[in-house]
Amino acid sequence: MKLSVCLLLVTLALCCYQANAEFCPALVSELLDFFFISEPLFKLSLAKFDAPPEAVAAKLGVKRCTDQMSLQKRSLIAEVLVKILKKCSV
């Protein structure tokens, strides 16, 4: 539960910041990839951001945690995040 609240708050901060209410399509892709693709594929998708190895390792650590959630719970979280993104883009 704590992890989903953190993800929700981060998404709100990124999407609904006053200076830029437009969200980046890469954010949507990255969020959905985070919940639904395998760890090796996700690691490849993170390569496009050229993040430091420590950041990639941290993100993969969180992904390992969320991968332990049932697919149904991950789908519910993704659904809420998509709804938030839609509201932020209006």
From Swiss-Prot:
Tissue spec: Highest expression was found in skeletal muscle. Expressed as well in thymus, trachea, kidney, steroid responsive tissues (prostate, testis, uterus, breast and ovary) and salivary gland.
Presence of the UniProt keyword Cell membrane in the record: no
Key words of the record: Secreted, Signal
Signal peptide: 1-21
SUPFAM superfamilies assigned: Uteroglobin-like
Localization in the cell: Secreted
Alphabetical list of PROSITE patterns matching this protein: SCGB (PS51311)
Disulphide-bonded residues: none
Gene Ontology terms: cellular component: extracellular space
Organism domain of life: Eukaryota
Main localization category: secreted
A Pfam family of this chain: Uteroglobin
Protein's UniProt keywords contain Ribosomal protein: no
Family that this chain belongs to: Belongs to the secretoglobin family. Lipophilin subfamily.
Role summary: May bind androgens and other steroids, may also bind estramustine, a chemotherapeutic agent used for prostate cancer. May be under transcriptional regulation of steroid hormones.
Name of the protein: Secretoglobin family 1D member 2
Organism encoding this protein: Homo sapiens
